[in-house]
Amino acid sequence: MTTDIIKTILLVIVIIAAAAVGLIKGDFFSADQKTSQTKEYDETMAFPSDRYPETAKHIKDAINEGHSEVCTIDRDGAEERREQSLKDVPSKKGYDRDEWPMAMCKEGGEGASVEYISPADNRGAGSWVGHRLTDYPDGTKVLFTIQ
């Protein structure tokens, strides 16, 4: 009987020690803490699907196909990336060519997803995004979510 008590006490000590180590390292009980330590973006932008449904659908589809949901702002390279992403997609009367990731993102350019969408939706969305990113410096990583 004494042996059983000693085994039980040792087992309790091991469990308490393991839990203490886990709490100190942040491995247990805290998925949020672990996420914040590995966060790969600086800001979050909730894109309004009710205002720009075609653009929102394109962004969502492109992300689901494996394109980045994070945009690293790099305004200086935007024109070159726009040329790269649109070079094999001819213009089409009555439509704009929407790119995801956007040309202003380092992740954009060659291999970006390009869809034909209405000019009003595309240009409205571009203005909306541009206005909200104005104060962010180049190098800022923005996570896009669709609302």
Swiss-Prot record:
It is a single-pass membrane protein. Its cofactor is Mn(2+). This is DNA-entry nuclease. It comes from the Bacteria. It comes from Bacillus subtilis (strain 168). To B.subtilis NucB. It is an enzyme of class 3 (hydrolase). This protein is a subunit of a 75 kDa protein complex, which governs binding and entry of donor DNA. The complex is a tetramer of two subunits of the DNA-entry nuclease and two subunits of a competence-specific protein. Only the complex is able to bind ds- and ss-DNA. Mn(2+) ion stimulates activity. The activity can be inhibited by the 18 kDa competence-specific protein nin. The gene is nucA. GO terms for molecular function: nuclease activity. Residues 75-100 are annotated as: Disordered.
